[in-house]
Curated annotation (Swiss-Prot):
Organism of provenance: Aeropyrum pernix (strain ATCC 700893 / DSM 11879 / JCM 9820 / NBRC 100138 / K1)
Temperature remarks: Optimum temperature is 90 degrees Celsius. Active from 70 to 90 degrees Celsius.
Cofactor(s) recorded in Swiss-Prot or TrEMBL: Mg(2+); Mn(2+)
Protein name: Homing endonuclease I-ApeI
Biological processes per GO annotation: intron homing
Function: Endonuclease involved in 16S rRNA intron I-alpha homing. Recognizes the minimal target 5'-GCAAGGCTGAAACTTAAAGG-3'; generates 4 base 3' protruding ends 5'-AAAC-3' and 5'-GTTT-3'.
Amino acid sequence: MDGYALFYLVGALRDGSVYRYSRNYYVIWYSSNKDYLERVIVSKLRILGFHNVRVYQYKRGAYRVRISSKQLFHILVNQFEHPLSTSSRKTPWPTPQRVKDGPLALQIEYVKGFVDAEGSVIKSSKGVQVDVSQQIMEPLKFLAQVLEKVGVKVTGIYLGSDGVWRLRIASLASLRRFAHYIGFRHPCKSKKLNELLGRPLPGPSKLKGIGGGAPQGVEPAA
C-alpha cells in the first residue's frame, strides 16, 4: 500500500471508527464537509486500490465514507493499534508505534490527516490560532514533536473546561510555517486560515527551518 496515502488516512481516522459487524470489517471516516470526503478521503482510498467508494449523508449535515475491507481493518487494528469502536464512549487512541517509528515524511502525512479531522481555525480578540482537539494528551504531544521538526512552535497544550485537550498554534511565524508545511486539505479550514493570514505564503527559502531553510526531505503542504 502507498505509505503516504495510508498514513494520511490513519491520521484522518481521528474522526472515524473501525469496527466489525458479523462477517463485515468496516472502516469509516466522518466529516460535516462532503467535498472534503470526496476530494481527499475518497481519492486517497482509490490510491490504495479501493475504487468502489462513495460519500453518504447519514444524518442532516453529516457525511461519511465507509468501506468494508478485512485487509485494511487488520492493518489498522494490528499495525496502527486502532481500538475497535463500540456504542459506548470512544476509546482513547494513543499515537501508534508504527507512526512514531516512521520517517518524518510519513509522520507529516499522518499529522496532515489528523489536523484535517480534528483541527480548527479560530479568530479571537487575541488574534488567529489553530487548535487541534483530542480526548487524551499524548497524541497532541506527538503532534507537537513533529511540528517542531518543521519549525512550527506550539503555544501550548491545554485541558479545556469541557474535558478536551487542545494543542494551540498562535504565533504568526508558526502559523505561516504550519500553513506552508502542514496546512489543511479541508476546503473550509484551508480557506479560513489563508484569508486570516492575509497574504501569500513565502517560499521555502524565506522560511528559516532546520539548517536555515526547508527541513531536509520535507515538501510544502499539498
